């Protein structure tokens, strides 16, 4: 694939405003996302809910209708939604908060340029909590464009799997961000 950015006017929005999920399991999905995102319902439609976790009016909408069918494994479409966190402290705090509510990651993986915890919602959609392993976005971009990215991005996990309990222990023992960013790397 080639990087063919338009030479015309720049795309004017620089963030994803929200995402929508269709489900057959409305209440379990709304409950899970309330816990996962520490979100609140802004508007309950009866057949769905608009929810937010920040100052915006909504970041996620979950809804159902009579025509909704179950998701199938490995179907084409969105693979996961990634939510960026500012630092390892936030990643560990969210991991521990969610664990107390019975929500644990299905895949903890160090991609080299990010450290990520992937979670499965009640419908099997993956949601990723991720933190950059470098201090600047430029350093991350340089890593992604280099040979290390090609070496790291191998199926099935596209990085090195690690135990999130090890990450939490290291964090609480005072490990630096540089040390935490190496978790799972052999």
Where are each of the predicted segments found?
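Conserved short beta-strand elements that form part of the metal-binding/catalytic scaffold
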Residues: 40-75, 94, 120, 126-134
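Short alpha-helical
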Residues: 27-28, 57, 89, 114
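Short N-terminal helix-initiation segments at or just after the protein's N-terminus
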Residues: 19-30, 61-68, 158-165
